[in-house]
Structure formats: structure tokens, C-alpha cells
A protein has these predicted regions:
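A glycine/threonine-rich phosphate-anchoring loop and its flanking beta-alpha core
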Residues: 1-40, 166
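C-terminal charged capping/lid subdomain of soluble metabolic enzymes
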Residues: 19-22, 116-193
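Short, surface-exposed linear patches
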Residues: 21-23, 29, 78, 100, ...
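Intrinsically disordered or highly flexible coil/loop and linker segments, enriched in small
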Residues: 27, 31, 61-64, 68, ...
């Protein structure tokens, strides 16, 4: 990764990329620690070059372990994407990376609310997300996004929502939620201040 290329990007594109970087930091505990410990350096080009290289290596390891997407290991790369894609299709005003961050935020609430993640882990994930997305906005009529989540290419169900959630440090799983329950979680986004 050439840092000179990064210097040509507008701030919004850097934020979009931070969405994927932070997702990787949630999946790779050591990278997450590195991001939290070096938060003031997140816009330093040499640090970003180092982080992007770390992310590329992580993704390459995951893809190498599940090249044909047959074992399910690769599903971890979908973290935040089920909800992120649904919001992106429903509202469209933000970048893909911003929606992935918001999707991770809500899916983190789901993981905690459904008993898969402890509050300490959810707090850590929210701390990582806040490095790029300081305030999760309100989304009027967010429950309308349910239909987009059902149609998402990452969702393999027609009667429920499947998503990959983070349970703890570098550990996650795919879960399935009934549509009504997922809509209740989406409603949380309607009430954000």
C-alpha cells in the first residue's frame, strides 16, 4: 500500500476505508488493540499504510483457509454487512464503509441482547467503531430496511435474517433471527438522538 495514494483520497473515502479496517480490528484482536492504542494516529499516512497491510494479511489468511467459501470460515468477513447493506439500500446517503460501521454497531447490540456477547466485549466493539463513527445517527422508519436485509446476498434465509456476529475477542458465529425480532432491533435506530 503506497501512502501517497491514500493522501489523494477525500476524508469521506478515508472514513469509508476505516469501516473495513475497524471490522478487521473486531475480528483480529491484536489489530483491534493496535487501533485503540494508536487512535490519534489513525489519520497518519504511514500508520494507515501499516494498518492496511495488516488488514490485507488478515483477509488473505481467511480467504486462504476457505478459498471456495465451503467451510464457513470466510463468513466472518460479513461482519456488519447484513445490516449495513440493508441501511445502504434503504437510505443511500452515506458510504459503504459508514454503513458497515453502523451495521456492526447494531449487530453488536444484537449479539449482546441475544446473549452471545458480554457487555465488556460490546463496549470494546463500540470503542473501535467510535474511532471513525463518533455518533450513530437516527434512521426514521428503519424497520423498513427489513425487506432489504431479507434480500441481501449475505442472507441465506427467506423467512429470517442470518448474520455474522462477534462474540468475543476474535471469535464469532453466524446466527439467525426471526424477522420480527430483527425489526425490533432496527427500531432502536429510529430512536437515536
Amino acid at each position: 500500500c503506497d501512502p501517497r495514494f491514500l493522501s489523494t483520497l477525500p476524508a469521506r473515502e478515508i472514513k469509508c476505508g476505516l469501516g473495513e479496517i475497524i471490522k478487521t480490528g473486531v475480528l483480529d484482536g491484536a489489530l483491534g488493540d493496535k487501533l485503540l492504542q494508536n487512535a490519534p494516529r489513525l489519520h497518519d499516512l504511514s500508520f494507515l499504510q501499516e494498518i492496511v497491510s495488516d488488514c490485507i494479511r488478515f483477509k488473505a489468511r481467511v480467504v486462504e483457509q476457505d478459498e471456495m467459501e465451503s467451510s464457513g470460515i470466510r463468513k466472518c468477513l460479513n461482519l456488519g454487512h447484513t445490516t449495513g447493506h440493508a441501511l445502504e439500500l434503504c437510505y443511500g446517503r452515506r458510504s459503504h464503509g459508514e454503513y458497515v460501521l453502523i451495521g456492526m454497531w447494531l449487530e453488536c447490540l444484537i449479539a449482546e441482547g441475544e446473549g452471545y456477547a458480554k457487555k465488556e466485549h460490546s463496549d470494546r466493539v463500540r470503542s473501535l467503531i467510535s474511532l471513525a463513527e463518533r455518533r450513530i445517527p437516527s434512521f426514521p422508519d428503519a424497520r423498513q430496511c427489513l425487506r432489504y436485509a431479507l434480500l441481501d446476498k449475505k442472507n441465506d434465509r427467506v423467512d429470517a435474517i442470518s448474520m455474522y456476529i462477534s462474540e468475543s475477542y476474535a471469535k464469532g458465529r453466524e446466527i439467525t433471527l426471526p424477522c420480527e425480532k430483527y425489526a425490533d432491533y432496527l427500531a432502536i435506530l429510529e430512536k437515536r438522538q
